[in-house]
């Protein structure tokens, strides 16, 4: 006898997805594709179920604070927002990326509350001083570090290498530099376990490159794009290709390096979803505007 149950009706052409009725696991998978700013400013305001997912500490093991650097035109305070995201992780934060707005106070806030942090990315964070950077980083068990278009000294880099003994990935990207092997020698002296090294725009010469190859025997990926003081030909080129699996040449394109430029649109568009209004579960939602202060932030009950 044929089953009396009928198959579910196929979605009609033009029928839109009801984003608010997705299972929590699928909602979480979707929201993990978004940055922290999009989650806190938009996604968590969609409905109660999305807000519950957004409050789960597992959503905040990785925090991406990517922005375009137009800080004066924003209606919210990114530092306050970042602190809130760190708090939501409840100590489980393992990976964080900060673009433009990083400060010494914020970095120390992260370090004090994230003893398991393994990956730190600072892009164009000009307000962080060498002393403040070192004070925070020496407390962390970092394995991955990116310092792109920042102004930290070689002494800070050396201290990081001496304190973070399991450093496996370093990205130290700059605008093209005059010949200078200080960074390369500090890396060679203090980071022997490196597997991935990106030095776009660095001033290292053949001398610095040879020092890295001598001391970082585990290197698998070496990115020398825009390192125009390296003469990667002949014996040096042969040595690189024999000891390192992937080598990017000084003249290779840098189009795939994320340095804070605009990205494509978010993978999921929430523009057609009404944000929560008059919802009892959403009363007291925290305001990330510049008018908010840290005392209000500390007292807010999430």
Swiss-Prot record:
Transmembrane segments: none annotated. Disulfide bonds: none annotated. InterPro entries: F-box_dom (IPR001810), Leu-rich_rpt_Cys-con_subtyp (IPR006553), LRR_dom_sf (IPR032675). One of its GO terms (biological process) is protein ubiquitination. SMART domains: FBOX (SM00256), LRR_CC (SM00367). It is found in: Nucleus. The F-box is necessary for the interaction with ASK proteins. Component of SCF(ASK-cullin-F-box) E3 ubiquitin ligase complexes, which may mediate the ubiquitination and subsequent proteasomal degradation of target proteins. This is F-box protein SKIP19. It comes from Arabidopsis thaliana (Mouse-ear cress). The gene is SKIP19.
